[in-house]
Amino acid sequence: MYTASSERYDTMVYNRCGKSGLLLPAVSLGLWHNFGTNADPENMKAMCRTAFDLGITHFDLANNYGPEYGSAETNFGKILKEDFAPYRDEMIISTKAGYDMWPGPYGNWGSRKYLIASLDQSLKRMGLDYVDIFYHHRMDPNTPLEETMGALDSIVKSGKALYVGISNYDGPTMVRAAEILEDLKCPFVINQNRYSIFDRTIEQNGLKKTANQMGKGIIAFSPLAQGLLTDKYLHGIPADSRIAVDGRFLHADALTKEKLAQIEALNKMAAERGQSLAQMALSWILKDEDVTSVLIGASRPEQIIQNVEIVHNMKFTQEELTKIDQISKGNL
C-alpha cells in the first residue's frame, strides 16, 4: 500500500496560474508518452509515485494519449484507484479533447457534441467524477469559437471540470476565446503550448505576452524539443532513444550537423551552470513569470528526480539568456 512522502511539499515551487486561485507545481508530469497499452505497469506506477513524492501534484493527460487511444487515461485510472484515492484532493488532473479520437464526424475537432462526449469517456476511463482542468486541444477552423467555448462553459457548470484551458492556440484566437469565456463567467485559467529554447512560436505569435497581460497561465509542453535538448544524441542515436524506438515525433534527419553544434554549445553552457542540458532547458522555460509550469515526460523514475532538481537553479543572468538566444539562432 502506497503512502506518500511526508516531505513532498518541502522543496517544490508552486506558481500561481495567471490571476486565478490555482497554484501549479513548477514541474508537472505529462503522460503523453510511456503510459500506453504496452507500457510496463510497475514502471508507470513508480513514475507517478516518484512524481507525487517530489511535490508534483499536476498530472496531464488527453483523450487520445497512448497508444492505443485512451490507454493512458485507463492506465492512470488504475494507478489512481490503487495508490492515490486518499490523495485526490491534493492532485490537479487535466485532460483534453480536440484531436481525432473515434470514427465518424463526431470524434474530432471542437463541436459541443464531441467535447462533452469525450470528457464523459475520459472520466469513465479514469474513474473520476471530475477533472481539475479540461482543455480544448487545438483550434478548430470550422466550428464557431462560441460553440466550442460554450461547451467548455457547460462542462464547468455541470461539475465535470473545475477550470478550463486551451491548447495549441495562437495569441489572437486566445484573446477571442478569453473574451467569450469571460462573458460566460467561465474560469479559463491556462494555455498549454509547445515551448522550448528551439521553439519560440508563442513568443512570435503573441500568445506569451498576451496571456501574461490578460492574467492567464501558460504550461509548456515539449520543453526538451522531443529529446534534442539533452546530451543523448551528441554521440549517435542510442538504441533506447525516442528516435530509435518511436519515430512519430522526432526523426533522425533532425540531427543535422548544425543542430548538433547548437546542442553541444548549450550542453557546455549547462555544465558551467552545474546542470545537465535537460535541466538547463527546463529552467529556461521558467526564467520569467509568464510560464506557470513546465511539463516533463519520463520513461523512468530517475528522470523525474533529475528534472525536479531544477527548482534549486532557475535563475539566469542576462548574459546567459543572450548567449542562449544566440545559440538557438545558430550564431555559435
Annotate each PLM feature.
Residues 1-91, 157:
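N-terminal binding-site loop/beta-alpha segment at the start of enzyme catalytic domains
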Residues 2-9, 143-332:
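Beta/alpha (TIM)-barrel catalytic core signal, keyed to glycine-rich beta->alpha loops juxtaposed to Asp/Glu
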Residues 18-36, 94-107, 130, 135:
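N-terminal small/glycine-rich loop or linker at the start of catalytic domains
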Residues 25-29, 59-61, 91-95, 134-136, ...:
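Hydrophobic faces of well-ordered beta-strands that scaffold small-molecule active sites
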Residues 36-40, 64-72, 140-144, 171-172, ...:
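Acidic-and-aromatic substrate-binding clefts and catalytic sites of carbohydrate-active enzymes
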Residues 38-51, 110-126, 174-178:
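Short, acidic/polar
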Residues 39-43, 71, 75, 106-114, ...:
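Alpha-helix N-cap and loop-to-helix initiation/capping positions
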Residues 123-143:
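Active-site groove signature of glycoside hydrolases
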